């Protein structure tokens, strides 16, 4: 008997699809080459993308929802999590979970802490204590899971929290203390050991957010000829969980992070199980249900390919390039590095009132470099964020970047700073974000330089200047409206 033939399903013309996708990508910033100094991470290793893409494609249809049907998911995840645990101070009792990214890892850390505080200490009104420099993902987690955020100021020059200040903010209702290794905005490592010890004294969990730098820092300390970073991982007494993204300095495709716990019992508090319905029994280790195993397989393949020796050398190069960059910025008139970065993230501010860092960013973008603007907040002046990755970690590439940056400052100084009409600031200060209607929102966006269709101008300095002048709560009200204009069907 012949095999049944598949039905003749009508298909659209496929020949043009690759060209259509390429046309869409043409408007994006490049993801290779190191010129996009935020959001993307490039190892600069030939063939690595193709290896990852092949692994991703092989497992794209595998559903991580049910590991009894797809046991390969268990093997892959255990090996990836085990690799992270071995690097970052894990021991025999360490457990972990593979997640879709840093935000999900942070969300799960907070959820786990909330459940742990409720079940073990009877906490009904949980709080999360963190430095003002902690990542926004923790504020998102507190919003979603009903925790009160207690922020602690940082030193105005080092941008590092004082352990005594954070310890003083801990109460009987604290479910979680958070420290960064490093902080995203300034690249500094908080006093992990001191904060973890203070938290342990009160029976409070302590999470280390090493999402952006953990993989780099862990391998950097394996390099023999460069200084190791301060202690920051699970080997530090009192640290109960740690998040590390593989799609950052692990250079894997997007959608790969690991959340480590001191033990499996703590991890269990963040899992969800449900059998009180007529369908299949559900157990979720992450916030997702159905999830493709593609990102997991791609991460597994890249970690195997690069290996410990490869990552150690990449981290060594990134460290040396970062030091070269910091020293070079110190020689550019009008620019200064904020704090003393412990990792590969550098925040560059202006000490010249005639030099606007946001105008510098526009000038750099016109030359093919993206430096991420960071508005002034809580004592941190307006600045530009630079993430140094392996693709730009060569002396000649850093020299090229410094030359472009020096030239951009000259042009930006000639253009002058972007001003904001004081009347606009006064008007904004009088607005109540909670009562703004559609017309007021539209007017506020127009004041910020955003058109009715959500299109942004080529030069963003004027928009950033206005947003920086607005109260943060008003900005938080306007940003979703802006996205609503962009993500619209008509």
Where in the sequence are the language-model features?
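Conserved PLP-enzyme active-site core in the AAT-like
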Residues: 47, 100-285
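Alpha-helical scaffolding segments of alpha/beta enzyme cores, especially the outer helices
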Residues: 194-197, 201, 324, 359, ...
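Active-site nucleophile and cofactor-binding loops and adjacent substrate-binding regions
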Residues: 69-73, 96-103, 130-131, 376
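Non-catalytic terminal extensions of PLP-dependent enzymes
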Residues: 1-34, 38-67, 71-74, 78, ...
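Active-site C-terminal subdomain of aminotransferase-like
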Residues: 227-344, 348-353
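Short glycine/serine- and small hydrophobic-enriched flexible loop segments
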Residues: 86, 111-115, 300-305
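Short Gly/Ser/Thr- and Asp/Glu-enriched loop/turn motifs at secondary-structure junctions
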Residues: 92-93, 339-345, 377-383
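Short loop-beta-helix segment that forms the pyridoxal 5′-phosphate
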Residues: 84-108
